[in-house]
Structure formats: C-alpha cells, structure tokens
C-alpha cells in the first residue's frame, strides 16, 4: 500500500512538472520570432537595378555582385536576351530579380500608341521564356515612365497586360558620367541618404555597361558598410514609379 502511494505521488509530481518543461522552449521560440520580426522591420533594405542588359559586360557585373554577395534586379531588352543567352540564363540561375525593358528602347516606337508598349513587353517576355524558361510581370519603360507613359497607356500595360511598373528614386547617372566614377559614386550615396531620411526604401538605377563595372565595387562596399541589405524586386513588392501607381 505504501509502495502504491509513493508511486502515485511520484507520478503526480511528474505530471505537474511536465508542462513546465516546455515553457522555456516556448518562451525562447516566441522571443526569437519577435526578435526576427523586429530585425526585419528595422533592416535597411535597398534595391539595386540594372537597365539595358544583358550585354557583353554582364558576366563581369555578375562576378562583382557575387563577390559582394549582392542580389540585383535586371530590366532586360528582348533582343539582348536572345543575343546574350548565357548571361540571361546565369542571371536567372543565380537568383537575381527579373524585369523587362521592352524591345526597341526607342521612345518614338515604344510610346507610339497605347498598345505598342504592351506589345514590346509581351515580346520581351517571350524572349525571356524562350531563353531561360521563365516569365516576369515586372517592367521598366524606356527612359522612365514620365512623361511618356500617359494614363491610357498605363491602363493598357498594367490593366490588360497585368504588369507592375517600376521606375527609381536614386539615379546614378552612370550613363552620363562614364568617365567620372567619383561623380557616379557621389550621386548614389547622396541620393540614398536623402531617400532614406524621407523614410523611403532606395531603388537605385544603374546600367549594364562597362563603365559601371569601374564604380560598382566602391558603391557596394560603401552601402554594405552602412548596413544595407540588398534584395530583389518581385511582384509582391509595392512598385515605386513616377506616377505613384501601385498596381
């Protein structure tokens, strides 16, 4: 009888203590989850984008990005994707963001009508699919969407076409200052700081060209030193464009 009482007492004690064994684990998991969420909310996110590629210089550009463990988003031209197929495939394989930049890059042709731009983006998407087996809904129109992309044009591209329009809020002007790398660097850093002060996430415009390769390492090193995390654009990221069109 005494043995039975001792057994019951021991069993009862174990049952009472059993839930307590999980409290520290649960509390730790909750705290870790909260810390992770807070860290993400406070993260300094930046989006680096490249227009006009792929080109003969894309391989070196990708090497630099890989060296600094950075992902970017490429807004590519249809004919260039077909001409530089290995570069296109590598962009996809290495997990960079994918965007379309049309076919002609000629304002008089792309913006000729409300449907000419849509046709170019659809054609560019077919080129991407043909070369790399994927498609994208992200677009950046030639020379930016303002003032060319009138409301009716946007409704066709974003409404009927189902595309998401991206411009930028940090212009490196690397196409203009091809030999003045310090100017390009200063443009990026000053504008990034200004945009961040406004509480906005920086979207940096650069170009897939030889001159950009000279300044890119300096830019990446500086931004990483300031704690920026480079992420890619996706359909789930709210678009930044000159019309404030969130479609």
Range-by-range predicted roles:
Residues 1-15:
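Bacterial N-terminal signal peptides that target proteins for export
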Residues 16, 20-21, 213:
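Hydrophobic alpha-helical transmembrane segments of integral membrane proteins
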Residues 16, 81, 170:
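Hydrophobic pocket-lining residues within nucleotide cofactor-binding pockets
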Residues 20-40:
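Sec-dependent signal peptide cleavage junction
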Residues 33-131, 135, 222:
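Active-site beta->alpha N-cap acidic-glycine motif
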Residues 36, 40, 68-72, 80-82, ...:
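C-terminal domain-boundary segment and adjacent tail
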Residues 72, 98, 164-165, 230:
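Hydrophobic beta-strand scaffold residues
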Residues 105-224, 228, 236, 243:
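Catalytic domains of cell-wall/extracellular-matrix polysaccharide-remodeling enzymes
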């Amino acid at each position: 009888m005494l043995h039975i009482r001792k057994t019951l007492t021991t069993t009862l004690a174990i049952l009472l203590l059993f839930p307590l064994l999980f409290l520290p684990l649960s509390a730790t998991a909750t705290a870790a989850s909260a810390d992770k969420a807070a860290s993400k909310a406070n993260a300094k996110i930046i989006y680096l984008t490249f227009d006009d590629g792929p080109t003969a210089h894309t391989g070196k550009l990708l090497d630099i990005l890989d060296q600094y463990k950075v992902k970017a988003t490429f807004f590519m031209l249809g004919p260039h994707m077909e001409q530089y197929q290995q570069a296109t495939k590598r962009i996809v394989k290495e997990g960079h963001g994918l965007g379309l930049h049309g076919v002609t890059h000629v304002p008089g042709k792309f913006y000729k009508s409300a449907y000419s731009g849509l046709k170019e983006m659809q054609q560019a998407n077919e080129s991407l699919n043909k070369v790399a087996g994927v498609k994208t809904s992200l677009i950046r129109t030639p020379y930016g969407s303002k003032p060319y992309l009138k409301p009716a044009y946007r409704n066709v591209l974003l409404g009927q076409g189902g595309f998401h329009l991206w411009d930028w809020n940090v212009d490196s002007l690397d196409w203009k200052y091809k030999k003045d790398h310090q100017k390009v660097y200063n443009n990026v850093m000053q504008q990034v700081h200004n945009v961040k002060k406004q509480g906005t996430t920086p979207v940096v415009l650069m170009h897939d060209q030889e001159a950009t390769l000279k300044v890119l390492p300096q830019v990446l090193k500086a931004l990483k030193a300031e704690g920026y995390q480079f992420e890619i654009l996706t359909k789930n990221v709210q678009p930044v464009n000159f019309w404030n069109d969130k479609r």
